């Protein structure tokens, strides 16, 4: 037992020694410049292997206004609507703060066509999708255009229908 502990100790020391040597290495000036430089003209995107990443959004909320159903230039349908979410925060003085946020959602294809007939203002939905940004580019004067954030929906699940305007109707 004692012998195995000393063996583990030697291997641990060897590993720590190698790690400290690697940590002490300094990158060259050229490596630092390459790291922060804009992409070179000869950059081949196929050479780069991307690390694992996730762009996923899940929202549960209510539809703010009746959705807008349109057909794109490519002839395919899309649906645009806003979903409202609420968050509640307790402040230091004990009062509760209600934060309401509006999220722009876009749905494409057959799902847009189906949802245009089933959801309306007040419908409760669960939306799963990804974030998408547009705008933010510089114009000729060097001013940046407004950057907009959208959610491109992959799944939209109705949770509850909007309340009827006249509850006496069946």
Swiss-Prot record:
Residues 1-30 form a transit peptide. One of its GO terms (molecular function) is enzyme activator activity. NCBIfam families: ssb. The lineage of its organism: Eukaryota, Metazoa, Ecdysozoa, Nematoda, Chromadorea. Expressed in eggs. GO terms for biological process: DNA replication; mitochondrial genome maintenance; positive regulation of mitochondrial DNA replication. It comes from the Eukaryota. Disruption phenotype: Reduced mitochondrial replication, transcriptional hypoxia response, sterility, arrest of germline cell proliferation, reduced frequency of apoptosis in the germline. Severe mitochondrial DNA depletion in somatic cells but does not result in major anomalies in worms development. Hypersensitive to ethidium bromide. Interacts with nmad-1. This is Single-stranded DNA-binding protein, mitochondrial. It holds the Pfam family SSB. Keywords: DNA replication, DNA-binding, Mitochondrion, Mitochondrion nucleoid, Transit peptide. It is found in: Mitochondrion; Mitochondrion matrix, Mitochondrion nucleoid.
